[in-house]
Amino acid sequence: MIIQLIRYFKHAIIFNPSSAIRVAVLLAAMLAYGTTGFLYFELSENPDLSWTDGLWYTLVTMTTVGYGDFFPKTSAGRFLVGWPVMFFGIGLLGYALSMIAAALVTEKSKELKGMMTFSLKDHLVIFNFPGVTMIERVIEELRLDSCFGRERQVVLIDDDLAELPAELQKLHVHFVKGNPTRDETLKRASIDEATHAVILSKKPGDPASDNLNISITLAIEGRSRKVNTVVECMDPATEELLRKAGCDRIVCTSRFGANFMSQELLNPGVQEVLDDLLSSRKGQQFYFVPFQGSPAPFSAVADACRGRGHLALGVSRADGVRINPQQDFQVSEGERVITVGPSRLAVLSV
């Protein structure tokens, strides 16, 4: 082990050093030259000088600050130390700063092009890029809800996007470029530590996008079943396959689109109502509030909701949803009350 370390040191440091190591060595040599040279020539003129003073003079000269608290008084100190430190030191320092700036630019470019690996926790991962507007709306709606929070990190995975758009950069979205069905790509997005995953259709309106979403769902569920996955699909026939793949929730946009069209025809204005209820940006929203405590009739639960500024619409249970149930319908602990209100309630009890 020691022999291997020595060989690595000889190869990487002595025989084939990187540019950064070369610059660091040259800077250290210049600091040593300036410090020792300043003391060697100036100590006779000023016996109170110390090594710290010599180092300070060298640093001040190399950075062109020039405080003037220390300066060479002898001709040898000026021409053999001062001039070399000024010319060569400034050049070396400028080159070192340019290397640092180039490294920062390269790092930022890699991040925007999706070449980075992220170490995150309790974040959201969005799969596929159907367009800036869709991604923006999903993130903004989620961040407006206290359950999600404004500070939660978001990672976007897509294999075709060349660079993260400026609009998503403003939302502090991280980008991972790669095949979303591959383990290597999922690892780079820290999928094992994520709490939520939203799988969007890559080409809205194209049922063929469902095949990719099924593969992504299988890849996620094969790694971590604790991730809460919501999948968009185009073809209603795909829903059963997605359930078998293990996703938690499915949104069939083609089916909802047909429903919205027919309802708008039968009940003009329903679109405005749903837009208000489904958006966190304005008005009232739907909420699923956990019920806590002893079983109670729906009438008592509705009264408790009204007392907190909410309207009770129904109950979500393991066997389905009950909308506008009978007044004596029993609501048990663990079930969720469907309400409409101005903000999310943590729990509901009677």
How would you label these PLM feature ranges?
Residues 50-57:
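The feature identifies polytopic integral membrane transport proteins across all domains of life
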Residues 1-34, 39-42, 46-48, 61-63, ...:
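Cytosolic regulatory regions of ion transport systems
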